[in-house]
């Protein structure tokens, strides 16, 4: 390393010396140029043609003497014009500048050498920490390596188990936040193999109201089709998509005519997937916000009871799924927040109203497992902080309105946006004067 720096210093030193020499040469050349360009007196211009010829001849002779090789000659008595005093002064000044410029160049090199030696003598310093610390969550029990994500708030302990927090802003209700699982990217499974309670998992669907495609909606389709294949029930992705779309469009038509009421159809009579289907609309889409901003069918929620042949893991506690559509992230803040709140009201309202039905009283839904709605394909240009804040406000409004006796579970997402949003709402609820 020192050899490299020594080569660089030698190059800089040589450059400085060359700069000084060039400065001296430039000063000499400038003075010669000035001497040659001195104008003749006005009287000479008025001389006769004969005098002009003499002047031309003598001028040529003078130029031959000036540009002849050898040391510079002094002006002879035959020179046309005497040397100007200002020219001599400029030449002397330039000759004085040359050694000064050389000395400055050498001084710069010596200063650079001194600084480099000082830095080389100091011990190496630790690199500065990044502006935003990022620490990985603890490994899942499977001991598979998990991706790192943002560090949660200081008051939130980091444990490999699901994080359970009680929120005063939600009526002293416990909320579970899942950590990374052993699956790809650490995502939470839709359903557990051996659940202790009946969980309804929310499918973040699409504006077309069908099950399938990409993302979480595609994962639901794959899970249902795999269970059907295991039980030797012929079911393709195209058939599932068409069947789910037809049922949910029929339900939405009925629910929009009766907002705030749980509507149902006996889908088990003609469906290979659903035993019974319900829909709930808290706010009719496109009445409070513009669907051209948020997307179609936002705010409607569908609750399906799956048939045993397609129930995940074959466990009857996993036979409930919820389907909803989040607003498009590029919508205006007012339209987005209103549509997001209507979506959460639809989810919690559908479960709350279902638990009041004869089927729900016998076998109620005990927990709702949610992704961070709107953070995937339909996020657009909206930031995660904005989504987390909208989610927290919507959850608080839904719990306050329906007060359901269910547990809320948020699926793992690396940014912990849902957790951060609810923690912010909790601080505002406890310390309203601080805002």
Swiss-Prot record:
GO cellular component labels: membrane; symbiont-containing vacuole membrane
Signal peptide: 1-20
Cytoplasmic side: 117-435
Ranges annotated as biased composition (Basic and acidic residues): 55-64
TM spans (from-to): 96-116
Membrane-related topology note: Single-pass type I membrane protein
Principal subcellular localisation of the protein: membrane
Low complexity bias locations: 141-153
Segments for region (Disordered): 43-88, 120-162
Keywords, alphabetical: Membrane, Signal, Tachyzoite, Transmembrane, Transmembrane helix
Entry's localization field: Parasitophorous vacuole membrane
Entry annotated with the keyword Transmembrane helix: yes
Coiled coil: none
Residue ranges annotated as Vacuolar topological domain: 21-95
CDD domains per record: MAF1-ALBA4_C (cd21101)
Complex formation: Interacts with host SAMM50.
Biological role: During host cell infection by tachyzoites, does not play a role in tethering the parasitophorous vacuole to the host mitochondria, probably because it does not bind host mitochondrial import protein TOMM70.
Protein name: Mitochondrial association factor 1 form a1
Species of the source: Toxoplasma gondii
Source taxonomy: Eukaryota, Sar, Alveolata, Apicomplexa, Conoidasida
Gene assigned in the entry: MAF1a1
């Amino acid at each position: 390393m020192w050899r490299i720096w020594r080569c660089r210093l030698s190059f800089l030193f040589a450059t400085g010396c060359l700069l000084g020499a060039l400065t001296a040469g430039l000063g000499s050349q400038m003075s010669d140029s000035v001497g040659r360009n001195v104008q003749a007196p006005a009287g000479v211009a008025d001389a006769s043609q004969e005098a002009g010829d003499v002047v031309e001849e003598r001028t040529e002779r003078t130029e031959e003497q000036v540009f002849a090789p050898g040391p510079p000659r002094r002006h002879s008595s035959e020179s046309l014009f005497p040397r100007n005093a200002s020219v001599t002064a400029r030449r002397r000044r330039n000759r004085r500048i040359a050694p000064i410029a050389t000395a400055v160049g050498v001084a710069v090199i010596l200063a650079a050498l001194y600084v480099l030696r000082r830095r080389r003598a100091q011990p190496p310093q630790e690199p500065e920490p990044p502006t935003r610390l990022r620490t990985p969550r603890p490994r899942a029990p499977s001991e598979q390596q998990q991706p790192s994500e943002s560090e949660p708030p200081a008051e939130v302990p980091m444990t490999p188990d699901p994080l359970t927090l009680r929120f005063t802003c939600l009526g002293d209700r416990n909320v579970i936040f899942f950590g990374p699982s052993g699956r790809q990217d650490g995502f939470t499974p839709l359903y557990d193999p051996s659940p202790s309670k009946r969980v309804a998992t929310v499918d973040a669907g699409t504006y077309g109201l069908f099950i399938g495609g990409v993302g979480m909606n595609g994962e639901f389709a794959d899970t249902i089709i795999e269970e059907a294949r295991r039980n030797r029930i012929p079911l393709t992705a195209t058939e599932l998509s068409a069947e789910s779309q037809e049922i949910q469009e029929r339900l939405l038509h009925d629910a929009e005519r009766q907002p705030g009421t749980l509507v149902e159809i006996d889908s088990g009579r003609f469906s290979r997937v659903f035993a019974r289907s319900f829909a709930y609309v808290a706010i009719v889409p496109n009445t409070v916000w513009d669907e051209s901003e948020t997307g179609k069918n936002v705010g409607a929620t569908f609750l399906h009871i799956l048939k045993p042949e397609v129930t995940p893991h074959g466990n009857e506690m996993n036979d409930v799924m919820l389907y909803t559509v989040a607003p498009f992230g590029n919508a205006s803040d007012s339209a987005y927040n209103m549509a997001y709140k209507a979506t959460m009201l639809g989810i919690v309202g559908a479960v709350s109203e279902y638990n009041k039905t004869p089927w729900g009283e016998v076998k109620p839904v005990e927990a709702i497992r949610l992704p961070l709605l709107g953070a995937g394909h339909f996020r657009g240009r909206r930031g995660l902080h904005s989504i987390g804040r909208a989610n927290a406000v919507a959850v608080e409004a839904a719990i306050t309105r329906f007060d359901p006796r269910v547990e809320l579970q948020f699926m793992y997402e690396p940014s912990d946006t849902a957790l951060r949003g609810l923690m912010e709402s909790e601080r505002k609820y406890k310390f309203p004067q601080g805002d």
